[in-house]
Design a protein with these regions (language model features):
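Canonical Rossmann dinucleotide-binding motif of NAD(H)/NADP(H)-dependent dehydrogenases/reductases
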Residues: 1-30
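Substrate-binding pocket helix/loop in short-chain dehydrogenase/reductase
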Residues: 94-95, 102-107, 190, 202
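Short C-terminal tail/terminal secondary-structure segment
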Residues: 143, 222, 233-246
Length: 246
């Protein structure tokens, strides 16, 4: 039986790409998104590319939605093994122009979603005695922001810490929790945040002189989702072209 992986914010962009890579690696995939029509469309495109696919509606700011999504997954597949907390809002508002409401809205999606995903779905994985959780952080959360807003960067930095906290919580119960911190990736979100006229300047500042490969991120998720990844937990995996080196 295939393992089952749920990806949040998977109706488009990187989330959809991650679903495709997981399918190609032999996982059954749950495409979850706040926009159910988008999740359904993505699931339809993925049909026939590997394992079984299920679309579910999931507002990642809602604990009740996570609980309902888990119930749907268990009813459909009978199990859940892997969680990819990918959903995020990207804002580029200048620091001194960010309103308290906008700050709360960004943190309320980017950080709250990881907390709820780890808490609700992680509790189920821990009870089952096995699981893999991968949280999408960002280079912006490590170096104080890049082309993104301070609220985005702060939320992504907090994900790195939250990853360690949940990794400690679940370590003895067969569940690993890791984060991936991408730099600029060749993705719709990056191209939307960086105007075409600024792209050459961005590339010039990346040591490898290129944007990152979205498929590689998906393949890294696959590796961290494997049973053999049991000895890797609480780590943040940097994929940034040399922009941030430990």
């Amino acid at each position: 039986m295939n393992q089952v992986a749920l990806v949040t914010g998977a109706g488009q962009g990187l989330g959809a790409r991650f679903c495709a890579r997981l399918l190609a690696a032999g996982f059954d995939v749950v495409v979850s998104d706040r926009d159910f029509a988008q999740a359904q469309a993505c699931a339809g495109q993925l049909q026939g590319q590997g394992g079984r696919v299920l679309a579910v509606k999931l507002d990642v700011a809602s604990k009740a939605d996570f609980e309902q999504a888990l119930a749907q997954v268990l009813e459909h597949f009978g199990a859940l093994h892997v969680v990819v907390n990918n959903a995020a809002v990207t804002k580029t508002t200048p620091l001194m122009q960010i309103s308290p409401e906008e700050f709360d809205a960004v943190v309320g999606v980017n950080l709250r979603s990881v907390f709820l995903g780890c808490q609700v779905l992680g509790a189920h994985l821990a009870e089952a005695g096995y699981g893999r959780i991968i949280n999408m952080a960002s280079l912006a959360g490590q170096n104080g922001g890049t082309a993104t807003g301070a609220h985005y960067a702060a939320s992504k930095g907090a994900i790195v810490t939250l990853t360690k906290i949940f990794a400690k919580e679940f370590a003895s119960r067969g569940v690993t929790v890791n984060a991936i911190a991408p730099g600029p990736i060749d993705s719709p979100a990056v191209h939307a945040a960086v105007p075409a006229e600024r792209l050459p300047g961005l590339l010039a500042n990346i040591p490898v002189q290129r944007l990152g490969d979205a498929n590689f991120l998906g393949d890294l998720i696959v590796q961290l989702a494997r049973p053999e990844a049991y000895f890797t937990t609480g780590a943040t995996w940097d994929v940034n072209g040399g922009l941030f080196m430990r």
